[in-house]
């Protein structure tokens, strides 16, 4: 499966059960990266994608367990450790800022045998610079 996450400079993802930030340009980039694939999300993330042009997205609290090998999973509030063996691709969006955090990205791409394939930067709607890193096995 393909995992998509957003992190701060310390790999933080959430604070006090809330996302650290949001950016409409980033959501558009995610939608454009799906290559007609399925997007699976937790109910918490639904409002981020409700007005986007995603052809097929599925909402489930068990989305990581239900994902097929070619599915994309947008992860904000779940641990990835137990699902690590099934991850073939990891897309990390970096806010390039420090935010308070108590939930962190709990996998290391290098430890999973992944290599950095590409890095791109773009200006977001609420961030001067967002970095997109694509890792693959």
Label each region the model flagged.
Residues 1-137:
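Enzymes that bind and transform nitrogen-containing heteroaromatic metabolites
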